[in-house]
């Protein structure tokens, strides 16, 4: 449910993993995009250059997409999850496994995506799974080797999803720690913005390494306060996702941060302006607000997240944010 880059890439993975005869329905919000995907076997809007297998059928009709579906992958942006689910909930089959692909914390409620799914649909939390990891859609669509985490409190559902996704190039690992898997995914986008900002003002690898490492410390503090396992955040859904998103030129969050570091304004970048924006969703811009609020509610200190929030929403320059961080009181690691 969602024909963006990640939703489209995972639809391809499912068909490739399932082999001949496997069929996946891909819901697109815009009818013209669904028609284009079916006609051209490609998604030029979100995943240009990728040939899609014939087992993928796109539709803009949610009823058609969800009819008799026993596994539903929810690939809409985090802040749009609730509104979409409110429309889709009556169409869901009883007992279906609902899988969140979104990485973010809902503004206002400060809920993780699995909590939003349960809140809206009323399903048993054991029916809800999360897929998260170092998964840049363009690389996976190109069949480059990658790994991910399938987290669910129901081990049977986790293993079933693992089998559905296990292809020659995409390797899923199961995990019962839904909280840790979601926190790693939500927070890493914020740290990637910080890495991009540093690169944009011309800072080098030492700075990037410090941001990634201290960013991980923030993520660990928040995750553990929420009941996550440290091992989860040291794995693919934590360190793995953080490194990929902070380092890759394909990362929208890092790229946006880099443009901010070069002097673009947040408004112009998000609007898809000549400053370099592409108009696609960049979760970290919203996540820095909701993650910071969630951390405050648990009395967890997250200075990097706070600095990113100040740049994105309070008008602070990147240079001023760096000075603020470097001026903090020194302390043991």
Swiss-Prot record:
NADPH binds at residues 6, 29-30, 103, 137, 252, 281, 283. Its EC number is 1.1.1.94. Its main location: cytoplasm. Sn-glycerol 3-phosphate binds at residues 103, 133, 188, 241, 251-253. One of its GO terms (molecular function) is glycerol-3-phosphate dehydrogenase [NAD(P)+] activity. Keywords: Cytoplasm, Lipid biosynthesis, Lipid metabolism, NAD, NADP, Nucleotide-binding, Oxidoreductase, Phospholipid biosynthesis, Phospholipid metabolism. Pfam families: NAD_Gly3P_dh_C (PF07479), NAD_Gly3P_dh_N (PF01210). It catalyses: sn-glycerol 3-phosphate + NAD(+) = dihydroxyacetone phosphate + NADH + H(+); sn-glycerol 3-phosphate + NADP(+) = dihydroxyacetone phosphate + NADPH + H(+). It is found in: Cytoplasm. One of its GO terms (biological process) is glycerol-3-phosphate biosynthetic process. Pathway: Membrane lipid metabolism; glycerophospholipid metabolism. GO terms for cellular component: cytosol. The active site is at residue 188. It comes from the Bacteria. It is an enzyme of class 1 (oxidoreductase). Catalyzes the reduction of the glycolytic intermediate dihydroxyacetone phosphate (DHAP) to sn-glycerol 3-phosphate (G3P), the key precursor for phospholipid synthesis. HAMAP family: NAD_Glyc3P_dehydrog. Belongs to the NAD-dependent glycerol-3-phosphate dehydrogenase family. This is Glycerol-3-phosphate dehydrogenase [NAD(P)+] 1. It comes from Mycolicibacterium paratuberculosis (strain ATCC BAA-968 / K-10) (Mycobacterium paratuberculosis).
């Amino acid at each position: 449910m969602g024909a963006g880059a990640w939703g489209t890439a995972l639809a391809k993975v499912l068909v490739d993993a399932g082999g001949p005869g496997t069929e996946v329905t891909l819901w697109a919000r815009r009818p013209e995009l669904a028609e284009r995907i079916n006609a051209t076997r490609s998604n030029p809007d979100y995943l240009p250059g990728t040939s899609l297998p014939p087992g993928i059928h796109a539709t803009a009709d949610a009823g058609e997409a969800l009819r008799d579906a026993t596994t539903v992958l929810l690939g809409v942006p985090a802040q749009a999850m609730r509104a979409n689910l409110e429309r889709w909930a009556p169409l869901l089959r009883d007992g279906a496994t609902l899988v969140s692909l979104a990485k973010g914390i809902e503004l206002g409620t400060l809920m993780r995506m699995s909590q939003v799914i349960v809140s809206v649909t009323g399903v048993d939390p054991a029916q809800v799974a999360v897929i998260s990891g170092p998964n840049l859609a363009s690389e996976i669509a190109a069949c480059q080797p990658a790994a991910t985490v399938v987290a669910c409190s129901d081990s049977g559902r986790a293993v079933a999803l693992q089998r559905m996704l296990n292809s020659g190039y995409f390797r899923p690992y199961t995990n019962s720690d839904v909280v840790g898997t979601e926190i790693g995914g939500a927070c890493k986008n914020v740290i990637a913005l910080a890495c991009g900002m540093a690169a944009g003002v011309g800072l080098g690898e030492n700075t990037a390494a410090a941001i990634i490492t201290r960013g991980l410390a923030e993520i660990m503090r928040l995750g553990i306060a929420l009941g996550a396992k440290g091992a989860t955040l040291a794995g693919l859904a934590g360190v793995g996702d953080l490194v990929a998103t902070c380092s890759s030129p394909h990362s929208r969050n890092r790229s946006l941060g880099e443009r901010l570091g070069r002097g673009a304004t947040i408004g112009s970048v998000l609007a898809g302006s000549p400053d370099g924006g592409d108009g696609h969703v960049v979760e970290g811009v919203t996540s820095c607000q909701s993650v910071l609020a969630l951390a405050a509610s648990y009395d967890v200190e997250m200075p990097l997240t706070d600095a990113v929030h100040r740049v994105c929403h309070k008008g602070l320059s990147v240079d001023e944010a760096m000075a603020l961080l470097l001026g903090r009181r020194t302390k043991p690691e």
